[in-house]
Amino acid sequence: MNNYSWIQKKLHKFALSSQIIRETSFDIEKSLVSTKNINEDHVFVAGLARSGTTIMLNGLYKSNLFASLSYSDMPFVLAPNIWSNFSSSYKNTKLIERAHGDGIKISTSSPEAFEEVFWMTFNDKDKESAKNFKDFIALINNKYNKKRYLSKNNQNIRRLDLISKILPHSKILIPYRNPFQHSNSLLTQHKRFINLAKKDNFITDYMKWIGHSEFGPNYIPIIDENLKHQNEMNINHWLEQWYKTYLNSYKKYINSENIYFVSYEKLCQSEEYWENILNLLNIKIKYSFSFKDSEKEFSARFDSELAKKATDLESKLNSLTI
């Protein structure tokens, strides 16, 4: 986003900042492209940001079984087929490190989390949203000539019940990491993107337009009720977000038939664990994927009571099997 030209920035503003433009592009796309959806065996990856959702997206996308929104679909993500007729000249297969500075490299063909643009356009409490969401998935599958859709959207942790209701035959993966490593990563990224945004106002606008509020200048807590640690520059705020978010999900979905918790540490340590996930998702082609151990040394003063609760919850999550 920090390498966009003037015209690219203006095009993103035109396509993403206006509710009317987003709705109109979607309506035109539906009028020209088939929305027939013959399959609902889709996969949704949704957890707190920095839980390994992107690397898991990349790992599953490698199977070549799924369609997923990519950087090439920006900024007209609600009209991927129409936009593809105009965007071919913008394609760049050269890999560059993404703005997070975490070693993950991307190109215009890389899958990414742009689905939230749909939910920002169509209220998830609207009765028409279910049909529109199915149509949206069908349009993406149509463009990439696939039958299954792969989504990575951290904001979906707020609406897993809705997605399960709309697509009951799909599977949902909730990645999680060690709470202390995860909290440190969130705080680090929060500070990083706030500093980046001070140097380039477009970053704030871009993150707002794609619904990226997990950290940075547009930060909105996933859970904001009854917080003991409200200072987002304190690591305990992020540990509390980890604990409350995953505790809520654990209580609600522990016995769910289509929602599964996935340990990022186990992905890094066990090839068998990865193979179990492939089997779970009905991916017949077996292949390896390198999940990078992201553990970092750092010092911080954690709330002892909160730290114990988080550790106990992590143990419960780790006891679950795929």
Language-model segments: residues:
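Short catalytic-loop micro-motif centered on adjacent basic/acidic residues
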Residues: 148-152, 261-263
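The Walker A (P-loop) glycine that initiates the GxxxxGKT/S ATP-binding motif of P-loop NTPases
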Residues: 46-47, 152
